[in-house]
Amino acid sequence: MLIKASFFILISIFYFCDAEIKLIQATIRHSDRNPIDGSSAFLFYPKDPYKDRDWYPDGPMELTNKGKLRAYNLGKLLREKYKDLLGPIYKPSSVYFKSIAMTRAINTAHLVAAGLFPPSSSQIWNPNLPWIPIPVYSVPTEEDVMNYAMMSCENYSIDRKKAAQEVDRLLEVIGDVQDFFDYLSLNTGVNHTRPIQGWILYHQLAAYASLGLELEPWTDKIFPDGKLVDISAIEYILQTYTDRMKRLMGGIWIKTFLDHVDDLLSGRNVERKGFFYASNEIQVGAILNTLKVYKPHIPGYASTLIFELHESNDEYYVKVVYINENNLTEFVVPGCESSVCSLETFKKVLKNVTMQSFDIDCGRKGNFSIIDL
């Protein structure tokens, strides 16, 4: 069996040597941001030493200068990696940028676009400003089914409540969580009992660390590594716990990619080669867990998950590439021969978690809060 598997891996790699990349779809977490405001911080971190700051001039949760630079540099990295596919200049027909309706994500998309497409000589309109405007599309949150099924679908809410019953079992794997929750409660000033509280705390501490602010000594035991990450990571598992949740959170992104592939291969849209979606780390984590490649971690600022379509000898292949904290990983999706997965195998092994009908999986649409679960 091992010999057979190794044979298929060698064959796929051999055929892939002369492969041509045909299309990419990238899901990008927004870049470094300011912390949340004091009124919100008080709800989960009353002892927060920075809760009275207003984060002038950009405001709470908006991109910092460090975040702006990181997003721009991500665009430059993507330019280097995909320059042959995307071509030397920006053309509206060849790429598409879309963002969730949050300014930190919208601005991340604009900055990635700026790094990805510096103006050619014919596109320079101001010699002192090497930049061209590139549109970033967005829809209102209540219409954004790709990013907010968790808050708009009754079936998701039903499954999330069922998943919540598994929290204790997941926490047992980590061990000694009650002492840890007691430690968090003592130092934050709020009673910690659920993974989502640790998840929120992690993101606040990450925002402070990104700004270079001094963290309180008690955080040394839990941040940036340690049990806080392990407990926070449970949230990504809970968000995609059932196959239906996977379809609503991660499978809808797989379907979108496959729809783009179908448009290309059928000739409906042969010009557009790059699709870039600015979102948040929830979506990145959801896609990873839906693909069954997620390992406990918090997707970092500007982390990017990319589906690549390649063609070799009239056969099509998919690669899943993950850029996180300056590391690039090519995943082997379970059921695929290697990180180079034939398109048909990719579809087959992910069939149960690929969105087929949003209306059926979603059920009644409404306004449901994951914080209450």
Predicted features by range, described:
Residues L2-A19:
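Cleavable N-terminal signal peptides of Sec/SRP-targeted secreted and luminal proteins
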